[in-house]
């Protein structure tokens, strides 16, 4: 469990770095441009993947993965110099999470998705 939490923390840190690096360029493109233009970031979350991402008694998303994504959101907001960045929460499953990232419905998904060669052909991972 400690190893998974450590890997998730590292992934979030690297995701923040990777998402922030293009900001230093003159022109934004891709996901960061979409986020800046719309003022919205879409986070993919699992509904019952305790302790990573799940609903609490009040149907609010909580968990390690969700907290890490919120840290990434804070970094993106600061780097894009946005006064406000709305968060759109989108439930994902093991069956649809890759597709939703590919088609832009989800900007960031942080979970137990295995980083393997086949998936690297489909989406970008942070290590």
Labelled PLM ranges:
Residues 27-39:
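Short N-terminal segments immediately surrounding and downstream of signal-peptide cleavage
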Residues 9-20:
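Bacterial N-terminal signal peptides
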Residues 36-40, 73-81, 102, 106:
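Sec-exported extracytoplasmic/periplasmic mature domains
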Residues 21-25:
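Sec/Tat signal peptide C-region and signal peptidase I cleavage site
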Residues 1-10:
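Bacterial N-terminal signal peptides that target proteins for export
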Residues 29, 56-79:
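Short, polar/charged alpha-helical segment
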Residues 40-64:
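Short glycine-rich His-centered loop
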Residues 70, 82-127:
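Acidic, polar ligand-binding/catalytic clefts
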């Amino acid at each position: 469990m400690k190893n998974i939490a450590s890997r998730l923390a590292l992934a979030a840190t690297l995701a923040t770095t990777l998402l922030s690096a293009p900001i230093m360029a003159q022109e934004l493109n891709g996901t960061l441009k979409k986020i800046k233009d719309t003022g919205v970031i879409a986070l993919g979350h699992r509904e019952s993947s305790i302790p990573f991402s799940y609903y609490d008694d009040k149907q609010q998303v909580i968990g390690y993965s969700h907290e890490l994504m919120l840290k990434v959101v804070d970094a993106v907001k600061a780097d894009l110099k946005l006064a406000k960045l709305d968060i759109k929460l989108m439930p994902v499953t093991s069956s649809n999470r890759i597709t939703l990232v590919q088609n832009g419905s989800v900007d960031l998904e942080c979970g137990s998705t295995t980083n393997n060669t086949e998936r690297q052909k489909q989406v970008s991972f942070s290590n």
